Amino acid sequence: MAPAAAPSSLAVRASSPAATPTSYGVFCKGLSRTLLAFFELAWQLRMNFPYFYVAGSVILNIRLQVHI
């Protein structure tokens, strides 16, 4: 079985400028980089991610819904 690729590498391939032309400009690029950084961090810490999720939610006082 082939090893699973990191989600960020898949997202980078899927979000190349040639594949999806957008007019959001710099904001979209910055947001995409931020989201990719968080997805990469979540992938690397996938065993400990629930603990970081709870701690981050408590610290930032954010109530996020996760549908499984």
From Swiss-Prot:
Pfam families in UniProt: DUF4560
Domain of life: Eukaryota
TM regions (residue ranges): none
Record region (Disordered): 1-21
InterPro entries associated with the record: SMIM10
GO CC annotation: mitochondrion
Coiled coil region boundaries: none
Name listed for the protein in its UniProt record: Small integral membrane protein 10-like protein 1
Organism encoding this protein: Homo sapiens (Human)
The encoding gene: SMIM10L1
